[in-house]
UniProtKB/Swiss-Prot annotation:
InterPro entries named among the record's database cross-references: KRTAP_PMG (IPR007951)
Chain coiled-coil ranges: none
Domain of life according to the entry: Eukaryota
Lineage: Eukaryota, Metazoa, Chordata, Craniata, Vertebrata
GO cellular component terms, A-Z: cytosol; intermediate filament
Assembly mode: Interacts with hair keratins.
Protein name: Keratin-associated protein 15-1
Transmembrane segments: none
Family to which this protein belongs: Belongs to the PMG family.
Keyword terms: Keratin
Function of the protein: In the hair cortex, hair keratin intermediate filaments are embedded in an interfilamentous matrix, consisting of hair keratin-associated proteins (KRTAP), which are essential for the formation of a rigid and resistant hair shaft through their extensive disulfide bond cross-linking with abundant cysteine residues of hair keratins. The matrix proteins include the high-sulfur and high-glycine-tyrosine keratins.
C-alpha cells in the first residue's frame, strides 16, 4: 500500500483513493495545506498513511460564531475499511480559550463550533487531521 502525500487523494497500490476531510474554509489558502507521511501500528502490523496539516494565516479574519463544516469522502476498495474516527486537532487560541479537539467519523459530516463571544477574531492555530485505513 503506497501513498502519495502531495495531494488530498492518496494513491494506493491496490487502486482507489483515500479521501480526507476538507474544510470549506481551507480552500481560501490551499498553499497552506501540507501533507506528510505518517505511520501507525495495528496489532503487529505497521501501516502507512498521510496526515494533512493546515496552517491558517493570522491575517485571515473569520466570524467566530460560525460553525466550521468538515465533509469527508471515504471512497475506497471493498477490501479496505477506515479506522474511525478521522481526527481533526486544533491547537492555539481564538482569544477566548483553546479550541480543543474535534473528532469526525469517516463517511459523515462533522461540525466544530468556534463561538468566540465576539463578532470577529484572528485565529492563529494549526489544524491537523488524518484518516487511517486498514484491512478487513
Amino acid at each position: 500500500m503506497s501513498f502519495n502525500c502531495s495531494t488530498g487523494n492518496f494513491s494506493r497500490s491496490l487502486g482507489g483513493y483515500l479521501g480526507v476531510p476538507v474544510s470549506t474554509c481551507d480552500s481560501f489558502y490551499p498553499s497552506n495545506v501540507v501533507y506528510s507521511p505518517s505511520t501507525f501500528q495495528l496489532g503487529s502490523t505497521l501501516y502507512s498513511d498521510c496526515q494533512e496539516n493546515f496552517f491558517r494565516p493570522v491575517s485571515f479574519q473569520t466570524p467566530c460564531a460560525v460553525t466550521r463544516s468538515f465533509q469527508t469522502s471515504c471512497s475506497h476498495p471493498q477490501n479496505f475499511i477506515f479506522r474511525s474516527p478521522c481526527q481533526t486537532i486544533y491547537t492555539g487560541s481564538l482569544g477566548s480559550g483553546n479550541i480543543g479537539l474535534g473528532s469526525f467519523g469517516c463517511g459523515s459530516t462533522g461540525f466544530q463550533s468556534l463561538g468566540c463571544g465576539s463578532n470577529f477574531c484572528s485565529p492563529t492555530y494549526v489544524s491537523s487531521r488524518s484518516c487511517r485505513s486498514s484491512y478487513y
